[in-house]
Amino acid sequence: MAKPRVHEIAAEIGVDSKTALAKLKEMGEFVKGPSSSIEPPVARKLKAALEAAGLTGQAAAPAAAPSSAPRPGARSSAPKPGGRPTPGPQPTAAPEVEAPEASDVPVPAKPLTVAERQAQAEASRKAAAEEKAQAEKSAASATPDAPAAETPSAPRPDAGSAPAPSNGIPRPGIPRPAAPRPGNNPFASNQGMGTKPRPGNNPFASNQGMGQRPAAGAAGPRPAAPRPGSPRPGAPRPGGVGQGARPAGFGQRPAGAGRPGGAPGGAGRPGAPAAGGFQRPAGGFAGRPGGGGRGRGPGGGTAGAFGRGGGKSKSRKSKRTKRAEFELREAPSLGGVSVPRGDGNTIVRLRRGASISDFADKIDASPGNLVTVLFHLGEMATATESLDEATFEVLGTELGYKIQVVSPEDEDRELLEGFDIDLDQELEDEDDDVLEIRPPVVTVMGHVDHGKTRLLDAIRNANVIEGEAGGITQHIGAYQVWAPHEGYERAITFIDTPGHEAFTAMRARGAQVTDIAILVVAADDGIMPQTVEALNHAQAANVPIVVAVNKVDKEGANPAKVRQQLTEYGLVAEEYGGDVMFVDVSALTGKGVEDLLEAVLLTADAGLDLRSNPNKDARGVAIEARLDKGRGAVATVLIQSGTLRVGDAIVAGTAYGRVRAMMDENGDAVHEAYPSRPVQVQGLSSVPGAGDTFLVTEEDRTARQIAEKREAVERNAQLAKARKRISLEDFTRALEEGKVESLNLIIKGDVSGAVEALEESLMKIEVDDSVQLRIIHRGVGAVTESDVNLATIDNAIIIGFNVRPDPKARARAAREGVDIRFYSVIYSALEEIESSLTGMLKPEFEEVQSGVAEIREVFRSSKFGNIAGVIVRSGTITRNAKARVIRDGVVVGDSLAIESLRRFKDDVSEVRTDFEAGIGLGKFNDIQIGDEIETIEMKEKPRV
């Protein structure tokens, strides 16, 4: 859909474009001008903000009021100047004599009463309707009607001569000093344009879409005005003192034969109700009932009578433009460039992964100048490179802007609003009569190995734990079971989350989609770190908690201790006067399972309103997703509202498609899935991320467009996240010392949640600043040949989590020497990767003393310099070893080398303790008897 422009929105609401631009700036949305286009969500926010501020319709009202005000005013005051001496018989050569009279006449004008103003407004509306009808007629047929319309003004002697120039062409032959030549007036109707000027040539005409201009000053230049500064006698001044209500248009001065230089004729009276669009007796343009004074109003001065146009001078700039240019000149420049600066509180909203070009568009600056500024701030980036929030904070602080990076939730909400999809509004608009009761969604949480999956096995009468590697849940499982309650079979949806510390994100996701949380605590272990974390997730999601004290049949079990420990975290058992239900269970024997289900249903009925609308398109969450070799992308989704049917067009995160098939947790086909029902969906184009929202759209095209936009947003966010910030100092140091060692990884897993958990855990490994971990690709499914090619180019290691490579990938990896490692337990992968990073560290060396020799004699040689005769006191002195000379405990020579080592006349490689030798230290000759020569070795220090 086409994006709306600012001036279109302003016209629709009825405000001025400047007001709309100012409101956009307050909202943090900076656009260049009224013709700039904005996103539909921003347009809706702008309309809401203007309506909330009460600004709608303020631009249209001032435009309409002045347009009608001059006519009634001129009409009511028309009889007053009628008593003046008739100016018709005056000589043609003396038009200036009337100027003093005209300036003196407006004095007796008196203010209008409220009744008169209302009558004038009614008359102006009638006149406007008649003007529209008369504008459709030709000038020849319109002129004879003018005298009849001006019967109230019959006493004016020039009324009878008004029809003379009805053809609208002023005669050049008449000696009128102030009348321009026909070719001098570009706005006159006698320029070969027939009876009416062409709309496109007249920027002041009423049909130019400029209705917001005050009509009182729109007449502009007047071709037959001999007195440029004379106001209309007796006419009101709607624009204040500076804008006189001059007779409307060029046609107000017919310049007939009987009026060589006289006042306006009766046919063009601005206040006449039947003037009908102003007959243009002197070649004016229609529909503009009033002109501004000399340079005092929107209509301009009388300069237009001499062919220069009556508009505002082009060389003059508005105060706003001058102020902006002055601020730009006075703004301090960084790096020799000038950029617009904020006041320190100017908010700029940017999407995740935005570039310098995006920031430049927001503040109306040049991207190249911003790149220069950023370079002088110590950051190197290109104009189109995705930057992180910290970099924008540095740049915004320097330029006086507050940077607000849109959160992923708000970004996705605005994206959907662009397709007229508002999930929150849908929920608010639902009435109680369309809501139906749905089953509760229960998440099982707790510490690792406390028996969560075993408890679910006991509830489902199945054995899930045998399918998990190492007995640790690696995925989120979703099941629906039926339990008897008060004589009825009630459905309960269970979500099993991992308890290992690596699966923090998956636990948080489980808490966000659940209604009730079952906190499983082992009676023998008590409270553990992941127990507290799961408790915090549930409390943050404002989810009621039911505590299942497991393993009560085990030796050393102490359920009372668990109750006491949880009291410290705000969970007080009912038997202690609290409101949290504690149930003692044994997943191994099945004891207390029925009591636990009853506690869940009682909690759901007591404090939760579990209702949703099943009669609409489905909305929900993708709990888990994987890539199946035979079925393609398979996503486990939980329907939160609506009904999902086979054949629906669906979009989940960056994946889209049609629902080809649905199955429950047992593999049985499902044709319709109602709220709170977990199903496995086939038919998606790719594997969605765990926790992505899904929704049903009317068309495949809409689903594809939403997915593509989400993919672009996610790609930019990943680029900004992967960018390593490097300053100029770091860059110089890297050039001198060599590049930083990095371990490149490619992660492939069976489900998206496990890949995400593994990636987050790996990125938390901190070994040393000299070694960094880079994940260049992650995905769901088997290791493919393209993964091996990518690993070959980037020297990466491929980590497969519960997946295996296909034959071609295995053969290519063997041929290229790519290391592929497979894991089924997540912490095994973490330990090995950490060991690999430790092995990549540069070795650390420490000084170790290898020997000490005392100088007994100094032999001086002209060929070899001074030779030290020594006796080895400790250790071993070796040739070419590093040495230092120590005198009275002070080092007098360092970084030396033992270049020659002899015993008597024989060269030797080493001399042991208590043996004598001769040592030559090269060019170092500052040795004395009693000095010590200490030799050292650099040995590698083992990493801890």
Curated annotation (Swiss-Prot):
Residues 55-329 are annotated as: Disordered. Residues 55-81, 93-107, 136-153, 211-222, 244-257, 270-283 have a biased composition (Low complexity). Signal peptide: none annotated. Residues 471-475 are annotated as: G2. Residues 258-269, 284-310 have a biased composition (Gly residues). SUPFAM superfamilies: Initiation factor IF2/eIF5b, domain 3 (SSF52156), P-loop containing nucleoside triphosphate hydrolases (SSF52540), Translation proteins (SSF50447). InterPro entries: EF-G-like_DII, IF2_II, IF2_N, P-loop_NTPase, Small_GTP-bd, T_Tr_GTP-bd_dom, TF_IF2_bacterial-like, TIF_IF2. GTP binds at residues 446-453, 496-500, 550-553. One of its GO terms (molecular function) is GTPase activity. It comes from the Bacteria. It is found in: Cytoplasm. Residues 586-588 are annotated as: G5. Residues 550-553 are annotated as: G4. Keywords: Cytoplasm, GTP-binding, Initiation factor, Nucleotide-binding, Protein biosynthesis. Residues 82-92, 223-236 have a biased composition (Pro residues). Residues 437-611 form the tr-type G domain. Residues 311-322 have a biased composition (Basic residues). Residues 123-135 have a biased composition (Basic and acidic residues). Residues 446-453 are annotated as: G1. CDD domains: IF2_eIF5B, IF2_mtIF2_II, mtIF2_IVc. One of the essential components for the initiation of protein synthesis. Protects formylmethionyl-tRNA from spontaneous hydrolysis and promotes its binding to the 30S ribosomal subunits. Also involved in the hydrolysis of GTP during the formation of the 70S ribosomal complex. PANTHER family: TR-TYPE G DOMAIN-CONTAINING PROTEIN, TRANSLATION INITIATION FACTOR IF-2-RELATED. Belongs to the TRAFAC class translation factor GTPase superfamily. Classic translation factor GTPase family. IF-2 subfamily. This is Translation initiation factor IF-2. It comes from Clavibacter michiganensis subsp. michiganensis (strain NCPPB 382). The gene is infB.
